[in-house]
Amino acid sequence: MRKRAPVCYMMILIVLIMGICCSCQSKNKKVERVKDLEFTVVPDQNVPKELLQIINEKKESPFKLKYTSTDNEFLYIVVGYGAQNTGGYSISVDDLYLTTNAIYIDTNLIGPSKNEEITMVSTYPYVVVKLPYQEENVVFR
C-alpha cells in the first residue's frame, strides 16, 4: 500500500502540471487584428423580416447569431441579452474587427442610469449590426 502512494501523488502532480501548461498556452494566443470593420446598428423597422422572426423566437434568453441577407450582400450580427426586469437598457458595440480567420465583435449591456426613470416592465435588449457580407466565422466576446 505504501508503494502505491508515491505513484498516485506523482500521477496527480503530472496531471496538474499538464493542466497548467495547457491553460497557459491558450491564454497567450494573441489574435492579430487585420482591420476595423465599418458597420451600422440597424433599427427594428429595417431588420429583415425573417431575421426579426428569429430574434423574437430567441429573445427570452441570451443569444448570439449571424444572418446573411438573401442576396448575400449583407451580414447581420445579432447579440441579445435575454429578459431584463426593467426598461432603460442599451447596448454598446465596443469593437468589431477582422482577423486573418474570423470577425470579432465585443458588445456590452448598459443598465439604466441612476437618474433615469425606470419602467417596471420586462424588456429584451438586443443589437443588430449590419456590415457588407463576409464569409468569416463570427467570434463573440
Residue ranges with predicted function:
Residues 4-9, 19-141:
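Exposed, flexible binding/inhibitory loops of compact, secreted disulfide-stabilized domains
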Residues 15-16:
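Classic N-terminal secretory signal peptides
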